[in-house]
Amino acid sequence: IPHDWYKIRGFDWGYSAPFGVLWGAISDGSLINIGGKHISFPRDSLIIYREYYGWTGKPNKGLKMELPEIAKNTMQMQDNEVMNKQVADPAIFDESKKNMGMTQAEELAKYGCIYERADNKRVAGWQQIRSRLTGRDGKPLIYITESCKNLIRTLPIMQYDKTKPEDLDTSLEDHLLDVLRYISMARPVTIDIKNAIPDPTRDFWDNFNPHQIRKNKKVINYE
């Protein structure tokens, strides 16, 4: 991933439930070398190229990892890579959840893992993801690398909430989807409906499977 691309890190906190961190980059449309191949992504494409997922290996079961360890591991994985924006669930800024005089956000920041409040609008966030999948000029505006195994695993199992048809069923393993939503809202796109490709997300949460994800989102290799 080129150093000069706009990069965003997103975080969703969990203790008994999984936590998730995703790293994304916004393409400027230039050619890049991936695995010895020169390819380009449409300008403004969001490439999710790294994940850190705190689960036990069982769906919706978190590692019960403390914030300092999450922060240290996150920064180690990032390895001095510079982020342009870092967004997280606004709940970590809740003053009522202070521990030893610090909010969860302040505790993370103590170990170099700094975040600002994500735009947490749920319906608008899911629409941003759908817009990126719809894309422009026949090409999607979101890509996920094969290293992001848990995002690829959990994305197709999402379902609409039966009582809130514009929202997701929050009882499902939606933690990395929330992070993807935060990142998408940090760099929103506008899609011209008249020129958009047929919407592959019309039955998005109901009918997607991993094969369709690879077809519609172009899973790519990244080392």
Kindly give the residue locations of the regions a language model identified.
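Anionic group-transfer/hydrolysis microenvironments
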Residues: 12-14, 91, 180
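Short loop/turn segments immediately following beta-strands, especially the blade-tip
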Residues: 26-31
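Residue-level detector of short, conserved catalytic/binding motifs and their immediate flanks
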Residues: 7, 19, 84, 177
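Short beta-strand scaffold segments in enzyme catalytic cores
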Residues: 19-25, 181
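ATPase catalytic-site recognition across NTP-hydrolyzing enzymes
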Residues: 1-13
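Active-site beta-strand/loop microenvironment that shapes enzyme catalytic pockets
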Residues: 11-21
